[in-house]
């Protein structure tokens, strides 16, 4: 899924162990994105991995993001993961959603 979102919040970047990454660690952060249109639009909490996790976004930034959705089962429960494959800031635009 690739579309335009508004940034609601972004966590601090931290490092987690990874067998695939050089140096054995990968950068990771979480980001909250909402579809434009109003405060009751769909919102997503997604994980950003790798170098993209070091990019800082601010509240109300407009971004184009490609999200990958997956599910996994653990101890009889099903969980959904959302990972940001790509994220780009739309420069010089801010979107204010009426509360």
Question: What are the roles of these predicted feature ranges?
Answer:
Residues 1-99:
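Single-stranded nucleic acid-binding surfaces, predominantly the OB-fold ssDNA-binding core
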